[in-house]
Amino acid sequence: MKKYLFVALAALVLTGCLSRPPEPEQPQPPVTVEPVTPPVVEEPQPPVTEPVPQPPKIQQLDWLSSVQPLVNQMLKADGVNPGSVLLLDSVKNNTNGSLQTAKATSALHKALASNQTFSIVPEAQLATAKQTLGLSADDSLGSRSKAIGLARIVSAQYVLYSDVSGDVKSPTLDMQLMLVQSGEIVWSGNGAVTH
């Protein structure tokens, strides 16, 4: 049976084949290809940039000439005991802008360096005392009560609390000399910061 099936299948396949030879193909005319012009690619223009505005210039303030008259007034104030220890707190910025208060603090140190009235707490001792309170060495105490607490740790009799306030273009320097034991303000003064 399988033989007959195979023979029948072969006969079907063979009858499907062409018995006549294939006709020769007619040559087709060549297709002409028209050249395509490439599209003009425009060079991308760089985006128009706006000029970057200049950052505001930091004002150069003459801190030493600003603090010196106030320090002179303070040294002549009534109720100041010569030979006392003074804690010089860093100057705070309470203006409406940015100021280099580290330079102001440095100017206060310079102005008080040659005085005969107070002995200033050394900065290394101040940094150690700040660490005792859990503050970083660069931390501005920010409040009078913290400054007095720190002064008690370093055994200072006085604290000089200073801040700069007002408009950043014409700031005012305020200074207060406080007695550590009572928190009493022994002297206060203010003056314009000179440029």
From Swiss-Prot:
MF terms in GO: enzyme regulator activity
Organism: Serratia proteamaculans (strain 568)
Name listed for the protein in its UniProt record: Penicillin-binding protein activator LpoB
Signal peptide coordinates: 1-16
Function: Regulator of peptidoglycan synthesis that is essential for the function of penicillin-binding protein 1B (PBP1b).
Residue span of region Disordered: 19-55
Pfam family, one: LPAM_1
Keywords (A to Z) from UniProt: Cell outer membrane, Cell shape, Lipoprotein, Membrane, Palmitate, Peptidoglycan synthesis, Signal
PANTHER family: PENICILLIN-BINDING PROTEIN ACTIVATOR LPOB (PTHR40593:SF1)
Membrane topology type: Lipid-anchor
Family that this chain belongs to: Belongs to the LpoB family.
Lipid attachment in record (S-diacylglycerol cysteine): C17
Gene Ontology terms: biological process: peptidoglycan biosynthetic process; regulation of cell shape
Lipidation (N-palmitoyl cysteine): C17
Cystine pairings recorded for this chain: none
Location relative to the cell: Cell outer membrane
Assembly and interaction partners: Interacts with PBP1b.
Gene Ontology cellular-component terms listed: periplasmic side of cell outer membrane
Transcription regulation as UniProt keyword: no
Biased composition (Pro residues): 24-38, 44-55
